[in-house]
């Protein structure tokens, strides 16, 4: 017996890199996903995804399409420092709003949050407000912090020196060579996230969010299958 299942993309590389405007490879992939009736969970930081709204809606009519958007920095000036090669957080929040209006469910990735830089209540409140307005299904946080592999650490520190003089030394003194870099305010910020999500009906449990995205819905047949049914 064969059946369609959800396809996930965007976890390791953004499917809407600038070159996608010329190549259209992601759009062709979506055309195949739509043609063969697969579900979709796609993650991006780009508003270029709106170019393919027709395909996202077509996929969602047959099964389920979930768009995941990363929001980490509410302040636009800081966003341009931390994420110089993608559209601003405000624009990504507008994408969430448009997707909501078109009936496409969304999930926000509120990660990474950088200690001593954007790990403030003001920043988290701002991102939560965007998610509340867009009626996102869920918010993924993985705690409040960032992870640093050895190869990434050197590049990260160079950027700290460039944009936040003195911050590298603070990271070294606080975290050494640790892989996991939690915010000193992690506990209080996570309480804020959980409380706000509970008040507004937004899912914040990581396992439940991924179970939702992995669960295949055949809207034409009225049946549901999960990836876990085939493991």
Task: Show where each model-derived region lies.
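Conserved AdoMet/S-adenosylmethionine-binding subsite of the radical SAM
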Residues: 4-174, 178-181
